[in-house]
Amino acid sequence: MMQDSIDFGTMNIPKLFRMMFIPTLLGMVLSATINIADGIFVGRGVGNDALAAVNIVAPFFMLATGIGLMFGVGASIVASIHLSHQKVKVANINITQALSVSLCIMLSLSLLVMTFRAEVALLLGSSEQLLPSVLEYMNWIVPFLAFYMLLNIGLFIIRLDGSPTYAMLCSAIPALINLTLDYIFVFPLHWGLMGAALASAISVIVGSIMIVVYIVGFSKVLHLYRPKFSLKSILLTIRNIGYMVKLGSSAFLTEAAIACMMLVGNYIFMRYLGEDGVAAYSVACYCFPIVFMVNNAIAQSIQPIISYNYGIQQWKRVRQAFKLALLCAVVCGGLACVGTILFCPKVSSLFLGNHGNAYEIAISGIPYFSLGYVFFALNIVCIWYYQSIERFKPATLFTILRGIVIITLSFMYLPVVCGIKGIWLAVPLSELITFVIIVVYYLLKRTRA
């Protein structure tokens, strides 16, 4: 079992960040890259309508990941602070509560969605033409959403336990399994959307098994704690879960924001450009997770460092870690923007072929979409910073503004002002406005202090 020697309270911050960031980044980027390969297989092996159908169902992935992040972040922050005070038993109780309650929630939601599949598909923006494909994909994805959630929570626990390299493997190995099975199921076996969904389900089950094996058999500090069912224990669990949800709510809302971006975007693209517009938009939505994963890797790597040192009031180390994360965010966001603009035609052709209306829509619009990457990167790091120091109110407010309120208004009104170009600029505008709000908030707080 791969375990790393990490001390969050004394190690050099750049070295500590590097030890956390590199394996986290590799695991996340590989996972996002495989997700793109999945889209390519579906687009080229099944067709543009199938690709659009996957994009319709994509908010479910965001939901499962969001719940996983909410409980994972909340439990990680609380456990980090307890560990900094040598309260190992309390930290173990927290992670056990987070895992058990989140599994109950996700299983209940999956059952509810499967009961009303057609209604939910139409609510997500499916047209009658896409509905059969959407339902086929849902049938093989929704029952396994709990495994997606478990994988996300488990990664936080393993990194906090001091094993970021093994956490990377928990992302990388399922991603490679997904890639292999995707190709086999879609091309040689011709299983279509069912094959693509089944490949994803099998891979995430493998990842979840790896998580459970580590926590049960190889964890150094963090272990599952046998739950108690007395009235006092239940009330304490409710209190602890409520606090973890508060701390992790902005992480959930970040995923919900991506789901909102897809959902509202699907509606607007369908309204203005039809199925071809949704297919073109799905290329941006498939590529966007790489940008998201890179910046999420920065934030998730810095979170235990900030939370631990916040717990022991080492503010100099907290500020040093935050500044380092901001610098990485600017560099990564800038590179992503330039790369998207330069390679947009090649990437779009992988999904859609190099001809047709959907391809033309994609290559003309995606460069505009990429202009918001730097501001997105900065916003993610700032929001995670506030989460990590238990400032959940501003973190939640900024997430709601950028991911739900401003982006919805931008999608609604920018096309009226700027035409089709305005649809693609809706996301960059919402990120820019949010960043300005965060900077103003920070300056006002610093002035008052």
Predicted regions mapped to residue ranges:
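Short alpha-helical transmembrane segments in multi-pass integral membrane proteins
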Residues: M1-F21, A79-F144, P188-G248, I306-G372, ...
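Short runs within selected transmembrane alpha-helices of multi-pass transporters and secretion channels
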Residues: G72, I141-R159, A167-N178, A196-I211, ...
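Helix-loop interface residues and adjacent transmembrane-helix termini in multi-pass membrane transporters
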Residues: T33-I36, G45-N48, H82-H85, L160-D161, ...
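Small-residue-rich hydrophobic transmembrane alpha-helices
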Residues: L51-L111, Y148-A167, A280-V338, L342-C344, ...
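Alpha-helical transmembrane segments of multipass membrane proteins
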Residues: I36-I40, L111, E119, I153-I157, ...
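Transmembrane helix-bundle signature of multi-pass secondary active exporters and lipid flippases
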Residues: T24-I77, I141-Y148, G242-N309, A329-A336, ...
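Hydrophobic side chains within alpha-helical segments
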Residues: D38-F41, G162, L181, F185, ...
